[in-house]
Amino acid sequence: TANLNDVITKIVEKYQDKKININLEENLTINMRLNSFKRCLMNLIDNGLSYGKKVEIFTKKTLSNIIIFVDDDGPGIPEKEHQNVMKPFYRIDKSRGQNKAGVGLGLSIANDIIRSHGGNISLEKSPLNGLRVKVSLPL
């Protein structure tokens, strides 16, 4: 069991030269494999910063889940591509750009890690007009 806020805060500190805003509910603890979870969150942050200039992370607790939102202000991903980008090595030509570094594994690895924790990842349009990654984990 780990304090989710501590984990997120420590990860975000590694990106001190980047624009990342966090808004975390207090006292969120969750069962996690710490190193795997850190890798997942870093993949999501790296993805957001690769395509946008700003990332926002916030958390919300429901009756049965903890939800982590990772928003960016990049070009987003068309809804018809949401399932495809979860596949290993899948890259989008137009909306996110082939000129970016990466091989198309970040979202796939993050998805696998969250699923192994009993949760799921979904993609939506962000209020920042980019991509919102919604991570839902059981309490």
Question: What function would you assign to each model-found segment?
Answer:
Residues 77-90:
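Short conserved segment of the HATPase_c
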Residues 21-31, 63:
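Conserved catalytic submotifs in the C-terminal HATPase_c
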Residues 72:
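Acidic ATP/Mg2+-coordinating residue in the GHKL
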Residues 54-64:
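Short beta-strand/loop element within the Bergerat-fold HATPase_c
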Residues 37-41:
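A residue-level detector for a conserved hydrophobic packing site
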Residues 106, 110:
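Short alpha-helical Gxxx[C/S/T] motif in the catalytic ATP-binding
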